[in-house]
Every structure is written in structure tokens, then in C-alpha cells.
Amino acid sequence: MKISKILLGAAMFIAAPVVKGGCQVMAQNALQEPIVVDTPFVHDPVMAYENGKYYLYCTGHGITQMTSTDRKHWTIVSQGVFKNSEIPAWTHDSVPGFTTHIWAPDVIRFKNKWYLAYSCSTFGKNTSAIGLLSNTSLSDKDGWKDEGCLVASKGDRDNWNAIDPNFIVDEKGNPWLTWGSFWDGIQMIKLDKKTMHVKKGAKPQTIARRHAVGDASAEPNPTSKFAGTNAIEAPFIMKHGGYYYLFVSWDYCCRGIKSNYRVAVGRSKKVAGPYLDKAGRDMRNGGGTLLLEGDKKEYEAMGHCSAYSFPDGDFFFCHGYSVPKNGASILVQKKINWTEDGWLMLE
């Protein structure tokens, strides 16, 4: 069933968290009846599939979550992943100024357990952290366990930003984590199979960046003079055939109708790269084949994507800044088709 932007906005306002006793909790009149929408308002959507049901997680207080059986009608879960937005204390210690508004989660099933990574940060700074949760089933909304911090960055120590995590498992069954936004671009590190934390002795390596392009007309990050013109973030790796495909988002999100977000892609036969675009350019040196951008009619801009092989095919998801909805960020879903030479096209 369709629900207007006004009604949905009002319902979400009713369920909005309020500050009490130093933490954010759901208001007493929080939403009780489920709301079902066919075009949910989201930022940074990721998905998982379990027992005939799709689970969507995205940026929001306590990590916003929704469920669906057909990816057409989404039930908004009134409670975030973190019950009553009770975020682990370590997040506030690691990231001064961080609130309960969590960015860009990712979710994966590994060795009979679900893992969810999430971003803790503040705009324009790279003092950030990526947290980890675990659960035995996505249907157990109260079953998420805090597994602590995966990686963290500090502005006076690191030239990368610990946000926008993405898990990938290689052909040998080894888990890896990618992340990054601005600064020195997209990072990658190997994880331990037993703990899903960083493997002992592993070091981050850069697998994609923008500033090497040397584009003098590139727009600087308006929120931080230190982030430079390296407008790349939101990595997501999908394995298909004999290749790993690295999706990244270029340019700027979060400006509504003034956003210019877009998605680029490269591929590699090795999970750690090098990732090359269609022209053979290394993504570490500014390469990347443009895959998706706004058409200025339906969407002004689109970005921060994820991609999956589901029972009915391969699909690509992102958020798009809707022109008819005056720049509101909504869920975009596109079917993936593969060319004979192993590149993808979006319907």
C-alpha cells in the first residue's frame, strides 16, 4: 500500500527518539502499528535474505531496519537495531561528539552467524570508528550482541576515515573488510575467521582513491579542509564469476536536490586488487567506470550502493535523490545484467 510523504514523515516523527537520562530512548507514544511503504525513505541501504524474508538496514538512529517478503512492500520496524537506541559506551569514547545517529551499516552471514558492521562519526572529521554486532538470526530483533570496535581512525594519526564498512569473503573463505570516505580513499584489511576482527598483523591497504586524478576543478569537501578533493566513499564488493567487482560512490551525497552522487565500478581477479576499470585504469590512481548517475528527471543523483545475488536474480540497490519528491532520499532497486565480457549493466 502507498503512503504519502507527509503521512510517513508524521509517523516517523511520532516514533522519533527523545533524550532522557543522557541517552536516546523511544518516546512513550512511539509507533505501535506497522507501517508498510513501497518507496521507503533511506540512506545507504544494505540487505540480507533469510527464510523467505528480506531485511533492509540503513543509516538512522540506532540503525533503521525494515522487512519485506517481495522487495516491493516494506514494513518499517519501529525499533532500531539497537534497542531504545542504547549505543555501546565505547562508541562515545572513541568518537567525541557522536550521537545515536549511526551511518552506513553492512550485514553478512558467515559461519552460521550474522554480523553487522556500522559507522560512528561526525561530519567533516575522520575521527571515526566501525563497530561490530553479531546475531544468530535476523528475525531475533533483540538478539544483537556488541562485539566491540573493528577499526578506528584518528584525525592526528590516520589519513583515512573509518566509516562505510563492507564485508566480503574471498574464494578461500577468508573474510575481509573494506571502508573509507575522502582522505586517502578506500581501505581494505583481512579479518580473522574465528573472531571477525582484524587479523593479527594485518595492515590497511588503499584499493581506490580519487585525488590522483589531479582534476583542478574538483570540488573540495565543504566540511573539512583536510579531506581534500578525494570525493570517493561507500565501497561495496560483489563476487561474480571469476571477478570481484568494487563499487564506489563519487562526489557528494546528503544535499537533497543539490546532491551529485554517482556510482563507479572496477573489477579484479583478486579480492585485494588491483581493481581496474573498463579502460584498464587502476582505481588506486583515480580509475573507475561510471555505472550510474542521476537522470535529472526522476533522480538528481544516486549513490551508496549494495549488490546481491537473490533467489530471483542479481540486484543493485542504492539511495536516490528524487526530483518529484524535492530531493528526498529513497530506495532505488535495479536488476543487474551481465555482458559477455563480464561487465554489468543496470536495467
Task: Report each predicted region and the residues it spans.
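C-terminal segment of classical bacterial N-terminal signal peptides
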Residues: 15-22
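Hydrophobic residues within membrane-embedded alpha helices
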Residues: 10-11, 39
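Sec-dependent signal peptide recognition
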Residues: 2-9, 20
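Carbohydrate-active catalytic/glycan-binding domains of CAZyme proteins
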Residues: 3, 22-347
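Generic detector of low-complexity/intrinsically disordered segments
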Residues: 9-10, 346
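Repetitive helical segments and hydrophobic/amphipathic motifs
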Residues: 11-14, 201
